[in-house]
Regions:
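Conserved small/polar residues in nucleotide/adenosyl-binding loops
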Residues: 166-172
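Short beta-strand element of Class I
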Residues: 34-35
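Rossmann-like NAD(P)-binding element
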Residues: 61-116
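Conserved N-terminal Rossmann-fold NAD(P) cofactor-binding segment
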Residues: 38-74
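Rossmann-like NAD(P)(H) cofactor-binding subdomain of soluble oxidoreductases
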Residues: 92-157
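N-terminal Rossmann-fold NAD(P) dinucleotide-binding loop
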Residues: 19-20
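Glycine-rich Rossmann-fold phosphate-binding loop(s) that bind the pyrophosphate
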Residues: 15
């Protein structure tokens, strides 16, 4: 991840399991100097930011905090993890409709404050929501990326390791 280096500001929108895990990884590896967590549930974002600060006290220095869209000014990278999880019995089409509405409300707000950032969309279903993010934001498509099939690739690697009795890293 050569793009994210010291001196860079990263904003993570969505402080749920995925957003918090991404934020923690960025902090523990020292891949940015500023890390902002934004969530509609402000106490959740605050709690996750505190957990990351306390959990990385002996790691490279990263300024971790919670905030609002306006605090994302000068972000170099924005990671979007918003959306609801699929409920039992819910179709992927219904999930897509719900999460597209959420994306349509988030993107215009964040792009007001971070129009020059690169965006990584991690929300599900990622391909549709990446397209939605581009459409509703007006951002240059070259600056908006979907996480794509990373999870599928990880699952394949895990299965290959299990059936071949080898370490996960043997299948890179």
């Amino acid at each position: 991840m050569d793009f994210v280096k010291k001196g860079k500001k990263v904003t993570v929108i969505g402080a749920g399991n995925v957003g918090a895990s991404i934020a923690f990884t960025l902090a523990i590896k020292g891949l940015c100097s500023e890390l902002l967590l934004v969530d509609i549930n402000k106490p959740k974002a605050k709690g996750e930011a505190m957990d990351i600060m306390q959990g990385t006290a002996f790691c490279p220095a990263v300024d971790v905090r919670d905030g609002d869209y306006a605090d994302a000014v000068n972000s170099d990278l924005v990671v979007i993890t918003v959306g609801i999880a699929r409920k039992p019995g819910q179709t992927r089409i219904d999930l897509c409709k719900t999460n597209a509405k959420i994306m349509a409300s988030v993107m215009p707000e964040i792009t007001k404050y971070a129009p020059n950032a690169c965006y990584i969309i991690v929300s599900n279903p990622v391909d549709v929501l990446t397209y939605e993010a581009i459409q509703v934001s007006g951002l240059n498509p070259k600056h908006v990326f979907g996480s794509g099939t990373v999870l599928d690739s990880s699952r394949l690697r895990t299965c290959l390791a299990a059936v071949s009795y080898t370490h996960l890293r043997a299948h890179e």
